[in-house]
């Protein structure tokens, strides 16, 4: 699964808007949009935040 698909899957599973997920991760709404559209691969630090957030919510 591509990173963009993982972001959208996690967001939908948690019933979050793009804005709400952005707030949870400390990134901008535009960043979440780019990630989901597969326009940009996030930096390692941002990927780590995303995966840690998912793990804390029970999403693997």
PLM feature spans:
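Recognition helix of helix-turn-helix/homeodomain-like DNA-binding domains
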Residues: 27-42
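Short basic helix-loop element that most often maps to the first helix and adjoining turn
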Residues: 5-20
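Short amphipathic helical patch at the helix-1/turn junction of helix-turn-helix
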Residues: 1, 11-13, 27
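Residues in the recognition helix of alpha-helical DNA-binding motifs
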Residues: 10, 24, 35
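Key DNA-contacting residues within the recognition helix of helix-turn-helix
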Residues: 8, 33-34, 51
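DNA major-groove recognition helix of helix-turn-helix/homeodomain DNA-binding modules
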Residues: 43-60
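Short glycine/serine/threonine/alanine-rich loop segments
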Residues: 16, 27, 59
